Amino acid sequence: MSNTIADHVKAILIALGEDPNREGLRDTPKRYEKALEHLTKGYHEKLPSVVKKAVFQSGMDEMVILKDIELYSLCEHHLLPFIGRCHVAYLPSGKIIGISKLARIVDMFAKRLQVQENLTKQIAEAILTATEAKGVGVIIEAKHLCMMMRGVEKQNSEMTTSVMLGTFRKDDRTRSEFLSLIRK
């Protein structure tokens, strides 16, 4: 037996008492392998290749916010999805970044096995690195299927995490402006 993800999925199906050769499951191991490769493709991406040449000189010195960026990731504890939205903001210091790159940074880290707390920090630090901003704020609000489908089985809970760097951490007014603008 080879050592592919599909081979291991087939073994899991057998361990569950399923027949991996029945019609509905015959192609499941390969489909799952392909899905998992997509859901974890962030491991093969690096910040410079995601941002490319989309950081530009600018005199803009007011807050830039991109809110409601959809995200999904896999919980590293149970390999079950968590799904939510991410709000990012930065205070430029002579440079701005193409807005699609903010969403791509979110995806690069979300498409890995994650916990939401680390994901939030990784996104904030990457935006700070890419933009050299005066400060960065990131908030993620997500529902975790590992908590909804198993364990405590709480269907309506939503986890919120935030990371504030630079002026977003040091200046209450900057942080308050960010929080008020994402709630509009």
Swiss-Prot record:
Pfam families: GTP_cyclohydroI
EC number(s) on file: 3.5.4.16
GO CC, one annotated term: cytoplasm
Taxonomic superkingdom: Bacteria
Keyword Nucleotide-binding in record: yes
Pathway(s) per entry: Cofactor biosynthesis; 7,8-dihydroneopterin triphosphate biosynthesis; 7,8-dihydroneopterin triphosphate from GTP: step 1/1
Metal-binding as UniProt keyword: yes
Binding site for Zn(2+): C75, H78, C146
Any GO MF annotation of the entry: GTP cyclohydrolase I activity
Keywords for the protein's UniProt record, in alphabetical order: GTP-binding, Hydrolase, Metal-binding, Nucleotide-binding, One-carbon metabolism, Zinc
Quaternary context: Toroid-shaped homodecamer, composed of two pentamers of five dimers.
Record PANTHER family: GTP CYCLOHYDROLASE 1, GTP CYCLOHYDROLASE I
Protein name: GTP cyclohydrolase 1
Source organism of the structure: Coxiella burnetii (strain RSA 493 / Nine Mile phase I)
Gene field: folE
